[in-house]
Amino acid sequence: MTTQFSVEGIELELTRYPKNQESNLQAWDAADEHLIKHLKETEQVPVATAIINDNFGALTACLRSMESQWPLAVETDAKTSQLGTVQNLENNTLSSDNIQWLNSRENIPGAIELVLMKLPKNLSYFAHQLNRLSQVLPEGTQVLIGAKAKSINKSLLELFAKNLGPASASLTWKKTRVITCTADGKVRALPTESQWSIPDLNLNITNLSNVFASGKLDIGARIMLDNMPKGDFKSIIDLGCGNGVLGLNAKQLFPQAYIHFVDDSEMAVESARQNWALNKLDTLGLVGEQATFGWDDCLTHLNEGIRPELILCNPPFHQGEAITDHIAWQMFLQSWRALKNGGILHVVGNRHLAYHVKLQRIFKNCTTVASNGKFVILQAQKISKKAEPHENGESSSDTPNPQSSLYGGVKR
């Protein structure tokens, strides 16, 4: 893997986030290079620019290297993308001043004069993004999209015309093309959220456009729901929560529990939040917020004082279009650190991913709870001789649950 980005006289050191990933993965692709090449060749001057789907900040860093105060609004659904962009700006001594950071549901400023995008894998999400742009971009605004040449076809160009304005594609360079779309000034309505139900669990589910398994229960979650852990848990984390279905069911099974939902996708976190409210799962009389929600890189920014008794985890094995197991490693390692001594990590995964090897290495134990031809449910318990914080007198007896620091303390 190279970390040296070099295009049209721009020299940068770019790394993925987090840095400790497979050596064959890099922080940008040829579509990033093609977009920058296009800007250089057309002698684009610095104007108020929105950058959308910039995986690890290659586009953002390039524009700030071309002009240190290039006015930018940077939108992403992935927390790791935002953190990676900040990391690469810092590593290249580039200013992040006056960059407006947006999640995938916030509207870009109305004063934007140029938009740079990368084509995401999820075309329903992409159509949603184009719809949102149609609500704020004046007629004639240019939107430049970098994509693999093989991803561009007639139906994709029709998608542009339907949701934002007419589009055309450049010649191929390094197996990529730049699509130029011109906003037609017509405002499109946002698509309705996907809604469905799980009758046997009495749950109603809403999925935003960039949430995995939109419109149905994925088979990994199904086998997990059929094999939820037994016990009396008061503090639970749904790690990589997606629409939150595992955490929702955990609350049904353990009504005295406090649930924390966390995901790298902001749309996933918002879907989980909406689903909690939709299903009205709060237990009457239980003190404090019974559900909290975090947009985070796994458990990186979880309060160190939090000690969950159970973590439910359905790890992704891809980051964008890259196949990788570093996310599972990170989830398992951070789960071991976060869990209360004796706490359980309950995991579902494809059999071929061999998560049992990782769990055995980290936890020194691993039990197969259930399996079928494709999936396996694994359970690992944290057994540590190191004293828990409360054993050293560090916790107060007036906290309502092991996650009190997450919820802001006791309500009196």
From Swiss-Prot:
Record-listed E.C. numbers: 2.1.1.174
Single GO term (MF): 23S rRNA (guanine(1835)-N(2))-methyltransferase activity
TM ranges: none
Coiled coil segments of this chain: none
Compositionally biased intervals (Polar residues): 394-406
Keyword field contains Thylakoid: no
Region (Disordered) residue spans: 386-412
Catalytic activity: guanosine(1835) in 23S rRNA + S-adenosyl-L-methionine = N(2)-methylguanosine(1835) in 23S rRNA + S-adenosyl-L-homocysteine + H(+)
Keyword set, alphabetical order: Cytoplasm, Methyltransferase, rRNA processing, S-adenosyl-L-methionine, Transferase
Pfam families according to UniProt: MTS
CDD domains given in the database record: AdoMet_MTases
Cellular location(s): Cytoplasm
Enzyme category, top tier: transferase
A GO cellular component annotation in the UniProt record: cytoplasm
Family: Belongs to the methyltransferase superfamily. RlmG family.
HAMAP family recorded: 23SrRNA_methyltr_G
Task of the protein: Specifically methylates the guanine in position 1835 (m2G1835) of 23S rRNA.
Entry protein name: Ribosomal RNA large subunit methyltransferase G
Organism: Shewanella sediminis (strain HAW-EB3)
